[in-house]
UniProtKB/Swiss-Prot annotation:
Function: NDH shuttles electrons from NAD(P)H:plastoquinone, via FMN and iron-sulfur (Fe-S) centers, to quinones in the photosynthetic chain and possibly in a chloroplast respiratory chain. The immediate electron acceptor for the enzyme in this species is believed to be plastoquinone. Couples the redox reaction to proton translocation, and thus conserves the redox energy in a proton gradient.
Provenance organism: Ranunculus macranthus (Large buttercup)
Annotated protein name in UniProt: NAD(P)H-quinone oxidoreductase subunit 6, chloroplastic
EC number: 7.1.1.-
Quaternary data: NDH is composed of at least 16 different subunits, 5 of which are encoded in the nucleus.
Amino acid sequence: MDLPGPIHDFLLVFLGLGFIMGGLGVVLLTNPIFSAFSLGLVLVCTSLFYTPSNSHFVAAAQLLIYVGAINVLIIFAVMFMNGSEYYSDFHLWTVGDGVTSLVCTSIFVSLITTIPDTSWYGIVWTTRSNQIIEQDLINNSQQIGIHLSTDFFLPFELISIILLVALIGAISMARQY
């Protein structure tokens, strides 16, 4: 989809704000249901990031798999938890909570200071996948595989890391209760 510059910029800012608000909602909201809905907002914004780059299949797959299946599964799992046990000792801070918040804050500060100083225009993106696709020797599923392993490798791996962290958090919560 070829959008004019101002509309494309507005869309990116809007989706970025959705990312930030959803991420803050996941971390800061005390109700697990609202936290899961905020995760759904983050995943919807992730799928909408693919539409300006003409990757409608990846956007639809992201929406169906992550929002339609994973987030609904998380919401059902949270609904089956006993809420009274979850909130009983919520106000107490431990040493582990302090260390975790210190590590997260240091990672956040390092990212905030590193990202603006990075020369993103110096990164050489691969053109091999475009050469393969232009030959019309492969079918659509092979084209999707090539795009996922070249052009969209970073977002694909980032969402897998986010899901791994969520799974580890769910397992640790389940072991506590």
